[in-house]
Every structure is written in C-alpha cells, then in structure tokens.
C-alpha cells in the first residue's frame, strides 16, 4: 500500500486553533494554524505544508515529507521529515498510522518530540509532547482543526 493510500483520510486542507505551552523555543500562546496534507510523486509521498500565526503576527512555517518506512516492521510504518523556519536540518521521525492516528517521534540533540495526529469525528487533533534533556515529558502543543476541503 502506498503512503498516500495509507494516509488517505488525513489528506486535505485543515485549519484551527492551537494552545502552545511556554518552552525554550517560544512563549505560551494561542495561535491560528493551517495545515495541508497532499499526495505527490504518484502517491509514494505525502507532503505537508503548515503555517502557524501568533497574535503578535509572528509566523512559524513548516514543510513535511512523509514516506513509507521500508525498514519498518510494524504495519503502517512511516518516516517524516519536517523542515521549518528554525532552519534545523531534520533527521527522520519514525512512526505508524493506525486506527485514525499518526504517531511520530522526532529525536535531535535537544531531545525528542512526540507527535500525534488523530482523526476524531471528522476533525483533526494534533498533540506534541516534548522531552528535553533529562526533563520529564511535557505537553507542548494541542491543536484542533476543521477540514476546509477534502483530498
């Protein structure tokens, strides 16, 4: 199964509101966000475009690439690269898709970020938890989005 078939229900344009906790990267904020997941490269890739707008008009932009994980042993195994305005070179996050949930873990020298995209009754929820250094895992972002347009 191609990654586009695997993530079919996630494809589309979404917009909503996010609650972001204070972190070493940014102060706490309530933001507006838009994200798009679309198939590309004959369905072998899903591309993600993301835009977050803060009350102070500051923006955070990201471009993601999702591919099937050829070495993944779990059904629905995926790899995700997320390039963003922090200009850090990303390593791949590893994760799985199943039961309407895409769970991914990105690891860097700063720590790890645990991402969960979940489809719930036609809406998309996004949760990001951070583990920085030897600190315990803490909630960082919670978002709720409505589908603006389909696949």
Locations of regions flagged by a protein language model:
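Hydrophobic small-molecule pocket/channel-lining residues, especially in calycin-type beta-barrels
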Residues: 1-151
């Amino acid at each position: 199964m191609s990654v586009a078939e695997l993530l079919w229900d996630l494809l589309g344009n979404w917009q909503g509101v996010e609650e972001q906790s204070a972190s070493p990267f940014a102060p706490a904020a309530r933001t507006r966000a838009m994200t798009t997941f679309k198939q590309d490269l004959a369905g072998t890739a899903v591309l993600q475009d993301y835009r977050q707008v803060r009350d102070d008009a500051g923006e955070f932009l990201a471009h993601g690439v999702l591919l099937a994980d050829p070495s993944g042993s779990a059904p629905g195994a995926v790899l995700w690269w997320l390039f963003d305005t922090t200009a850090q070179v990303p390593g791949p996050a590893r994760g799985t898709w199943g039961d309407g949930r895409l769970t991914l873990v990105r690891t860097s020298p700063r720590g790890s970020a645990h991402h969960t995209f979940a489809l719930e009754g036609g809406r998309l929820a996004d949760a990001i938890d951070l583990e920085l250094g030897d600190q315990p895992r803490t909630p960082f972002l919670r978002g709720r989005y409505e589908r603006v347009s389909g696949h």
